[in-house]
Amino acid sequence: MIRLENVSYNYPDGTPALRNINIGIKKGEYIGITGKNGSGKSTLALHLNGLLRPQKGKVLVRGMDTGDFSKLQGIRKLVGIVFQNPETQFVGRTVEEDLAFGPENLCLPPIEIRKRVDRALAEIGLGKYRYRSPKTLSGGQGQCVALAGILTMEPDCLIFDEVTSMLDPDSGKAVLERVKRLHEKGKTIVYITHNLEELQAADRIIVMDRGKIVLEGTPENVLSDLSLRYLGLTPPSLIELAERLKNHGVAVPWEKTSSPSSFAEEICRLFLKT
């Protein structure tokens, strides 16, 4: 669905942000992109729907080049971005007006706009706040409104750029659960975060450092890679526990579907066997 070919991009001061990036993202895939601050992951996100355009190489979305200005509207119908701070995306006085903004710019009929707004409100479970100002909502609710505003555009691909970094743990989990449900419904997901705990549901993880891709693979392979700490990243707590147990002669297998409860059950099972 999206292909990056030898993409490079420098900051205005000349510092490289992306260096010769090559990525292919398939329709329906769940991609996690991670790296410490300054690794280039957010700059990469802005390239995926043409908010930034490469200085070298190209980004293709369903064959459309983001460098072709005439294709940008079509590209942005297909690829939507939810940012770290939802308030940067609010344009309406009420939640309902905010959600209607995108479809109105697509010149859709009022009946279709109403259907999309109602559907998006039902998806995020915030129908009772439709007449509230989005700026009066909690951080988690505001992030869900920003997501709903993108959903009214009905994109095939959703990019989430550090969307939980300003949320409390419970709100963050709620947003992650909605991302998971969207993927189950067939949406292509690109989820960007420095928190590796949030990437266990991904099909594939890409690790960036200084504008380059330095690791890529399944969650099982990437999240257990010993080089993560040298890249300034902290492995998920379950993987760290599994590694410590392994060092003491207890091999507990970890999978992307592992939860704290299932992991604890496996440990108990192993000890009961002995």
Curated annotation (Swiss-Prot):
Enzyme Commission numbers on file: 7.-.-.-
UniProt-annotated location(s): Cell membrane
UniProt keyword annotations, A-Z: ATP-binding, Cell membrane, Membrane, Nucleotide-binding, Translocase, Transport
Gene3D superfamilies noted in UniProt: P-loop containing nucleotide triphosphate hydrolases
InterPro entries linked: AAA+_ATPase, ABC_transporter-like_ATP-bd, ABC_transpr_CbiO/EcfA_su, ECF_ABC_transporter_ATP-bd, EcfA_1, P-loop_NTPase
Pfam families cross-referenced by the UniProt entry: ABC_tran
Residues holding ATP: 35-42
SMART domains: AAA
Molecular functions (GO terms): ATP binding; ATP hydrolysis activity; ATPase-coupled transmembrane transporter activity
Segments crossing the lipid bilayer: none
GO annotations of cellular component type: ATP-binding cassette (ABC) transporter complex
Predominant subcellular localization, coarse grouping: membrane
SUPFAM superfamilies per the UniProt record, alphabetical: P-loop containing nucleoside triphosphate hydrolases
Membrane topology designation: Peripheral membrane protein
Protein family (similarity comment): Belongs to the ABC transporter superfamily. Energy-coupling factor EcfA family.
Subunit (UniProt): Forms a stable energy-coupling factor (ECF) transporter complex composed of 2 membrane-embedded substrate-binding proteins (S component), 2 ATP-binding proteins (A component) and 2 transmembrane proteins (T component).
Function summary: ATP-binding (A) component of a common energy-coupling factor (ECF) ABC-transporter complex. Unlike classic ABC transporters this ECF transporter provides the energy necessary to transport a number of different substrates.
The protein, known as: Energy-coupling factor transporter ATP-binding protein EcfA
Organism listed in the record: Methanosarcina acetivorans (strain ATCC 35395 / DSM 2834 / JCM 12185 / C2A)
